[in-house]
Amino acid sequence: MIKLYQKGEFESMYKELIDKSPELKKIITEKVKLFQKNPEDTRLDNHPLTKTMEEKWAFSVTDDIRIVYEWLGESTVRFLAIGGHGKVYKN
């Protein structure tokens, strides 16, 4: 199982997202659990990022919402950002 850490920015983005759309909490929780069990599950559309976000990865929570993360080891990741496609990929 994948071990998760969260960057402070991720936590504030998550809180902001849940405050605006409380119904997303359950969906996010389910996708994170799925990711922890099998990051390669095709339902996640997990993929490496390029250009300025090279060495980072992302998976889909909904059609628009992504979780951006980085691998810290073979079975450890740090969540960096969560939000709409335009928000998490703007950096």
Where are these regions (language model features)?
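Enriched for short, Lys/Arg-rich terminal
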Residues: 3, 12-26, 59-66, 70-91
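Conserved N-terminal entry element of GNAT/NAT acetyltransferase domains
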Residues: 1-7
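PIN-domain endoribonuclease scaffold, especially VapC-family toxins
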Residues: 25-33
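A short, surface-exposed loop/turn module that caps and links secondary-structure elements
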Residues: 34-59
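Residues that form or immediately flank small-molecule/cofactor binding pockets and catalytic motifs
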Residues: 9, 54, 84
